[in-house]
């Protein structure tokens, strides 16, 4: 994980512009604390903040072509770089061992028409001194964040985060995933497109002609087994590709299906270095797994069980509700959104990332993307047809860069940790999204993501392989969301809500929790561009707006993460109802005042260790620190 920032279309280089680019880069130095680099020349300035993972010694950026005519700043990882290097052996004089340098070799050979050859997560800016032109591009799904802006003088700006552009240019917006921007044309082009984005291209896949009109449950076992095997093999290959690293790495293990599958596969291959085609022993053969939650949370219990089963060195991070509340203001600054679901889920991940960083881990694999690809959210039980199901998965993938990808990337990057997501691997998507949608469906009480469960059931405890979906922010502890609702409801008055549209005419908050997050967001990012960068659409249980038409009961539900009692009943109808009434104010204050302290537990087959991560933190004056406007960005 790194940070990039810069300016194009410069008519005359000045010290002021260079200083501006440096200040832009400094805003995102948390993403790349290992080294800073800058290029100033021609009509461009490119700045780079590096987190060194591959080739730490010589892979500093910006990168240059052998003749120094092309310069490149990249945030990302190119998983197939070894294959590309082999193709250009003897044709291109590579200057470093960086995986990203293959972008320069491809550009030299093919101009701008090379993006499809990359399998990885990336956002990059390339300047060509010979043509005085530039290219900006982003990966297919938008795993790596990127923004583009402009000013009244015609300069084009780019940056990994909002904070690199806020206050530096007149307007900006998210750079679209799967697109590139070419300077001489001055417009965005889509480079990533797939046949599976159209239902007609996948509706008969893997299915014999005689079964094509059959109900999902009656599709032949042979055809079904073929799809299960395809998913298994493609995901194992994706995880193995993404284990490339010259520094210590780990896995995020929530105890849910998705992270457990990724962790189990990673453990299978962790003992050998993939850079040597698994011939040499890994430099760090012990795989470390990490889980976070309130004490006794469902996720922690299951994560512990999985870790014992697959044999990782497991680290369990306990946080208190108060510590979560104290972190909210920081979290909103780093993740750059006021979306309710994202803030709720990002807070424990942000706290976890700090501990991971303190242990010297620079990269972790995570399970994001499986719910979008396989229809794992509980509302998918209501999908009326295979076509509706498939089209919703495509919509969900197209919006991931605004939600889960943003959360996973920025929560970790806040502490200089890189997150990799094998379920969103480009080659894996081409297999998984071509699976017959009828096979993925989970009508009624049938469990979701059955294909994934059957593909990897033999690698996991059965209680986890067939465990039903939890929202991440529920799994870390049910009282977390309920307390957020209660505290933010007390912080925002009815009168403020009545005038919400006057204060926030763009994406007006629909409830007090959103209003409060929006207030904090505006303190950090006051521009209209910032407000428009965050999506604001009707949702239930993480659905898109289009899926609300699947069931009449969805219209009366207003919790986007699906954690309210009504949502649980309507979406699931499967799990025992959990109490979600708000705590009375006096009890809430008493509960939050308990000085439990964030704890780190290390569990492995050989030892158990416990260490207090933070000291006791009383509830000063019975008011959470995050409610104070002057609460600092860091302790």
Annotate each PLM feature.
Residues 9-12, 121, 346, 401-406, ...:
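Short, motif-level signal for alpha-helix interfacial/capping segments enriched in acidic residues
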Residues 292-353, 379-388, 410-411, 434-442, ...:
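ATP-dependent adenylate-handling ligase core
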Residues 104-105, 260-264, 353-354, 375, ...:
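Short, hydrophobic alpha-helix immediately C-terminal to the catalytic nucleophile
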Residues 361-371, 377:
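Short acidic/histidine-rich active-site segments
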Residues 1-338:
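Cysteine-centered catalytic environments shared across enzyme families
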Residues 1, 214-217, 222, 358-365, ...:
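Adenosyl-5′-phosphate
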Residues 602-616:
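Compositionally biased, low-complexity peptide segments typical
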Residues 17, 96-99, 118, 227, ...:
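Hydrophobic (often cysteine-bearing) scaffold residues that line and stabilize catalytic clefts
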């Amino acid at each position: 994980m790194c940070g990039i920032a810069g300016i194009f279309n410069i008519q005359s280089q000045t010290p002021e512009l260079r200083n501006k680019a440096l200040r832009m880069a400094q805003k995102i130095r948390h993403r790349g604390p290992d080294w800073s680099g800058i290029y100033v020349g021609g009509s461009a300035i490119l700045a780079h903040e590096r987190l060194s993972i591959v080739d730490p010694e010589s892979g500093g950026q910006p990168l240059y072509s052998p003749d120094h005519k092309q310069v490149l700043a990249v945030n990302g990882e190119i998983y197939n770089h070894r294959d590309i290097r082999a193709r250009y052996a003897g044709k291109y004089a590579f200057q470093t061992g960086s995986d990203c340098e293959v972008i320069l070799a491809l550009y030299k050979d093919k101009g701008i028409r090379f993006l499809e050859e990359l399998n990885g997560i990336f956002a990059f800016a390339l300047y060509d001194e010979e043509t005085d032109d530039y290219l900006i591009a982003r990966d297919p799904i938008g795993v790596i964040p990127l923004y583009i802006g402009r000013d009244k003088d015609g300069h084009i700006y780019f940056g990994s985060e909002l904070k690199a552009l806020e206050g530096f240019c007149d307007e900006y917006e998210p750079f679209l995933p799967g697109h590139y921007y070419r300077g001489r044309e001055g417009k965005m082009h889509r480079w990533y497109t797939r046949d599976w984005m159209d239902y007609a291209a996948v509706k008969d896949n893997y299915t014999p002609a005689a079964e094509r009109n059959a109900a999902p449950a009656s599709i032949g076992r042979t055809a079904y087994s073929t799809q299960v095997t395809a998913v298994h093999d493609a995901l194992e290959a994706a995880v193995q590709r993404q284990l490339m690293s010259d520094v210590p790495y780990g896995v995020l293990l929530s105890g849910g299906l998705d992270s457990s599958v990724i962790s189990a596969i990673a453990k299978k291959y962790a003992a050998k270095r993939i850079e040597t085609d698994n011939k040499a022993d890994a430099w760090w053969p012990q795989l470390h797994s990490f889980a976070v939650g309130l004490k006794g949370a469902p996720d922690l219990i299951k994560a512990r069980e999985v870790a014992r089963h697959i044999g990782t060195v497991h680290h369990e991070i306990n946080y208190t509700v108060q510590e979560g509340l104290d972190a909210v203001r920081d979290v909103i600054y780093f993740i750059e959104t006021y979306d309710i679901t994202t803030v709720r889920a990002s807070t424990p991940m942000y706290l976890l990332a700090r501990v991971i960083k303190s242990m010297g881990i620079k990269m972790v694999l995570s399970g994001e993307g499986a719910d979008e690809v396989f229809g794992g959210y509980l509302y998918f039980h209501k999908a009326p047809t295979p076509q509706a199901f498939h089209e919703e998965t495509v919509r969900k993938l197209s919006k991931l860069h605004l939600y889960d990808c943003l959360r996973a990337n920025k929560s970790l990057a806040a502490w200089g940790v890189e997150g990799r997501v094998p379920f969103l691997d480009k080659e894996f998507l081409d297999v998984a999204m071509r699976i017959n949608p009828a096979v993925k469906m989970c009508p009624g009480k049938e469990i979701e993501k059955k294909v994934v469960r059957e593909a990897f059931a033999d690698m996991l405890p059965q209680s986890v392989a067939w465990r039903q979906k939890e929202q991440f922010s529920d799994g870390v502890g049910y009282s977390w969301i309920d307390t957020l609702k209660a505290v933010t409801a007390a912080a925002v008055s009815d009168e403020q809500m009545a005038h919400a549209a006057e204060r926030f005419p763009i994406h007006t908050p629909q409830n007090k929790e959103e209003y409060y997050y929006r207030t904090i967001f505006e303190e950090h990012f006051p521009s209209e561009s910032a407000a428009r960068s965050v999506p604001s659409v009707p949702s239930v249980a993480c659905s898109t707006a289009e899926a609300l038409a699947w069931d009449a009961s969805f219209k009366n539900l207003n919790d986007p993460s699906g954690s309210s009692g009504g949502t649980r009943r309507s979406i699931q109808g499967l799990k025992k109802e959990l109490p979600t009434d708000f705590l009375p104010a006096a009890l809430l204050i008493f509960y939050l005042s308990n000085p439990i302290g964030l704890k780190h537990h290390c569990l492995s087959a050989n030892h158990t260790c416990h260490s207090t991560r933070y000291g006791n933190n009383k509830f000063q004056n019975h008011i959470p620190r995050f409610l104070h406007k002057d609460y600092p960005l860091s302790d």
